[in-house]
């Protein structure tokens, strides 16, 4: 995996639809050892100092410590959720309301009762199976509802939305100053 080889310590797999398409995701991150049951071998990459730590115990430990997250965002993934979260090596799950709403014929309706119920189902199932759920929020005030459900991991904002908000606010302030002069 290029991300792991670049030194990234966590991977989010998006769009799994069925157990068949998802069953090998975490094994691609884990070391190819009898204990980890992974398929990630050694190579000349940044995560191993290009040569110095190739195949070392530290290399294996780093792969074992990497966080493997799965984005559940299709109707078929929600229907197969328990089996998908039972795949060895999955550490975290995140629900994707935008893609999910499209997959059930409700594009853009992230707050539709069916979408909200699917998200709750993902959170409850993850907690029951010992998988950490993660929620996407835009602002800290959105966290309380998730904390009440047992969620303690969050993705707050996205790089493009953070930049857009900054440019809109700061650019607007500059525009006002230029207009006043």
Explain the meaning of each model-derived region.
Residues 1-181:
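Expand to "…catalyze enediolate/carbanion chemistry for C-C bond making/breaking, isomerization
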């Amino acid at each position: 995996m290029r991300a792991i080889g670049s030194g990234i310590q966590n991977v989010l797999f998006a769009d799994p639809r069925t157990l068949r398409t998802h069953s090998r995701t975490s094994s691609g991150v884990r070391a190819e050892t009898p204990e980890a049951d992974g398929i990630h071998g050694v190579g000349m990459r940044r995560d191993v100092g290009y040569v110095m730590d190739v195949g070392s115990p530290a290399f294996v430990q780093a792969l074992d410590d990497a966080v493997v997250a799965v984005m559940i965002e299709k109707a078929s993934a929600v229907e197969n959720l328990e089996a998908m979260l039972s795949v060895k090596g999955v550490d975290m799950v995140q629900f994707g309301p935008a893609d999910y709403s499209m997959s059930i014929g409700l594009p853009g309706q992230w707050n539709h009762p069916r979408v909200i119920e699917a998200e709750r189902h993902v959170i409850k199932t993850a907690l029951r199976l010992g998988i950490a759920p993660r929620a996407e929020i835009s602002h800290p005030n959105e966290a309380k509802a998730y904390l009440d459900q047992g969620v303690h991991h969050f993705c707050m904002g996205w790089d493009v939305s953070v930049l857009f908000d900054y440019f809109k606010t700061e650019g607007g302030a500059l525009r006002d100053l230029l207009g006043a002069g």
